[in-house]
C-alpha cells in the first residue's frame, strides 16, 4: 500500500485538477467502506455536497439531507471526531434513528481555516455493514479534511 504522504499527494492532485467529487474516489480507494462523503452544515441540516459510492449507484435519499440532531456528524462537531465500527452496538447512539442503518462510520471535521475557524462540515467514510478503519487511513482522512475547505465553501 502506498505511504500516507503518497495517498495524500494523490488526493491533493485530483482535488486540484478534478474537484472534490473525484478526490473522494481516491480517498475511498484504500478503505473497506462503501461510501466516502463531504457534508456541509446549513442551518439545522447537514447537506451532502459530494458522495462517492464504490458501487456507483444513485445516492439514497436518506443520505442527501440529514437533520443535524439525528446525524452521526453531530458528534464530529461536538467531539472533533466520531468513529463506530458497528452503530447497532454503540451506546452513544441510543435512540438515534440512524443507529443500525448506517452501521460503520468514521468522520472528522472540516474547518473554515480561511475565515471564521468554525466547523463547517464533515468528511467521512461509512457503510451499511460493519467495518473498522485502520489507523493510517484515519490519519489520511484527518489530513485530507484540512485540504477541502475551499472546495466545500465554493471559494
Can you describe what each PLM-predicted range is?
Residues 116-119:
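Glycine-rich acetyl-CoA-binding "A-motif" of GNAT/NAT acetyltransferases
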Residues 43, 55, 113, 128-130:
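Short coil/turn motifs at secondary-structure junctions
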Amino acid at each position: 500500500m502506498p505511504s500516507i504522504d503518497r495517498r495524500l499527494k494523490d488526493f491533493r492532485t485530483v482535488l486540484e485538477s478534478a474537484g472534490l467529487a473525484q478526490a473522494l474516489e481516491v480517498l475511498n480507494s484504500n478503505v473497506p467502506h462503501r461510501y466516502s462523503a463531504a457534508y456541509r452544515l446549513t442551518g439545522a441540516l447537514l447537506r451532502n455536497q459530494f458522495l462517492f459510492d464504490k458501487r456507483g449507484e444513485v445516492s439514497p435519499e436518506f443520505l442527501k439531507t440529514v437533520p443535524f440532531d439525528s446525524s452521526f456528524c453531530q458528534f464530529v462537531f461536538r467531539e472533533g471526531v466520531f468513529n463506530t465500527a458497528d452503530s447497532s452496538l454503540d451506546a452513544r447512539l441510543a435512540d438515534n434513528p440512524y443507529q443500525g442503518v448506517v452501521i460503520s462510520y468514521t468522520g472528522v471535521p472540516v474547518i473554515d481555516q480561511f475565515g471564521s475557524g468554525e466547523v463547517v462540515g464533515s468528511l467521512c467514510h461509512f457503510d451499511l455493514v460493519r467495518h473498522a478503519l485502520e489507523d493510517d487511513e484515519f490519519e489520511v482522512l484527518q489530513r485530507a479534511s484540512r485540504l477541502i475547505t475551499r472546495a466545500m465553501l465554493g471559494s
